[in-house]
Design a protein with these regions (language model features):
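An N-terminal RHG(E/S)-centered segment typical of histidine phosphatases
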Residues: 1-62, 77-81, 85, 211-244
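Acidic, low-complexity terminal tails and accessory targeting/binding regions
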Residues: 1-11, 99-121, 163-165, 181-244
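Phosphate-coordination/substrate-recognition cap region in phosphate-metabolizing enzymes
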Residues: 7, 50-127, 195
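Beta-strand elements within well-structured catalytic alpha/beta cores of enzymes
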Residues: 11-15, 65, 165-171, 175
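Active-site catalytic microenvironments for nucleophilic, acid-base chemistry
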Residues: 55, 78-82, 156, 182-186, ...
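Glycine-rich phosphate-binding loop signature in dinucleotide/nucleotide-binding domains
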Residues: 58-60, 157-165
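Short glycine/proline- and acidic residue-enriched helix-loop micro-motifs
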Residues: 119-145
Length: 244
C-alpha cells in the first residue's frame, strides 16, 4: 500500500495460459475427446508456465484464480508451486473464466471432483456447486454478454480482495480481452483495440481507493502482455507477430 494520497485497493494480474497443442494449429483428430476439447500444454507451454512461476516465486499473491480448463489449471499450478511461504496455497477455480466459445457444447467439461484428482491444490470459487461442471458454455454469445461475464468475475474478486491485495487470474486470450476491457471501463463494441495476449503474458492493472488515484482516476494499467520471464529462453518471443 502506498501513502494516503494514493491508496491501492487491488493489484490484478491477468495472465494467459502457456502454449497448448491447440495453439499450434495442427489437426487433433487422433486426440481423445477430452484432449481435443480440453487441451493440455505442450512441453514448451509447460516450460513457459514454469518460468512464469519462477517470476512470482518471491511475490506473494493473496489469491490465484484459474478457469476450469486444464491448460489454465496447469499454468496456475506452476505459480502456486513456487509461491513464498506467505503466498497463495491453492488455486481458486472460477467457472466463468472459461474461454470464449472455448469448448463445444457436446463436451460437458470436468466436474470439480474430476479436476481435483488431477490438480489437488484447487478449490472452487464461492457460490458454485462442487457437483457441477466447472466450465461455462458461451459460444455464440454477443460481445455485450461476454463483457457482462467478465464484469461478474471482476465484481467477485473486487468484493473479496481489498486493502492492497494481489490477485492473479489465469485464463484465456479471448476471455482475458473482455476482462481487460471490463477492468479499464472500455466498451469492446466501440474500442478497436486488441491486447493480443500471448502465452503466459502478464498484464498488471491497479485499482485505487475511490478518489485517491493519480489525476483522480481510480484504475491504472501498469503494464500489458509482459513476457520478460521468457526472454532468456525465448529472446524473439513476442517480437515478431505471432498468435500463440
Amino acid at each position: 500500500m502506498s501513502d494516503a494520497a494514493n491508496v491501492i485497493e487491488l493489484e490484478l494480474y491477468i495472465i494467459r495460459h502457456g502454449q497448448t497443442y491447440g495453439n499450434l494449429g495442427k489437426a487433433m483428430d487422433s486426440f481423445s475427446e477430452l484432449d481435443r476439447n480440453d487441451v493440455l500444454l505442450t512441453d514448451k507451454g509447460q516450460h513457459q508456465a514454469e518460468k512464469l512461476g519462477e517470476r512470482f516465486s518471491n511475490y506473494p499473491f493473496d489469491a490465484v484464480y484459474s478457469s476450469g480448463l486444464r491448460r489454465a489449471m496447469q499454468t496456475a499450478t506452476e505459480i502456486i508451486k513456487r509461491q513464498p511461504e506467505n503466498g497463495a496455497e491453492n488455486i481458486i477455480v472460477h467457472p466463468l473464466l472459461s474461454e470464449v466459445g472455448g469448448v463445444e457444447e457436446e463436451y460437458s467439461g470436468l466436474t470439480f471432483s474430476q479436476a481435483e484428482k488431477m490438480f489437488p491444490c484447487i478449490s472452487l470459487a464461492e457460490g458454485f456447486d462442487r457437483n457441477g461442471r466447472i466450465i461455462s458454455f458461451t459460444k455464440g454469445w454477443s460481445d455485450k454478454e461476454q463483457l457482462a461475464r467478465a464484469e461478474k468475475v471482476l465484481s467477485h474478486i473486487r468484493s473479496r480482495y481489498k486493502d492492497g491485495a494481489r490477485v492473479a487470474v489465469v485464463a484465456h486470450a479471448a476471455f482475458n480481452t473482455f476482462l481487460f476491457h471490463s477492468a479499464l471501463g472500455l466498451d469492446p463494441e466501440k474500442v478497436i483495440f486488441d491486447p493480443h495476449f500471448l502465452n503466459t503474458g502478464v498484464t498488471k492493472i491497479v485499482f485505487f481507493r475511490e478518489g485517491t488515484g493519480r489525476y483522480n482516476i481510480d484504475v491504472q494499467l501498469v503494464y500489458q502482455n509482459d513476457l520478460s520471464h521468457l526472454y532468456a529462453d525465448y529472446p524473439d518471443y513476442g517480437v515478431e507477430p505471432c498468435y500463440f
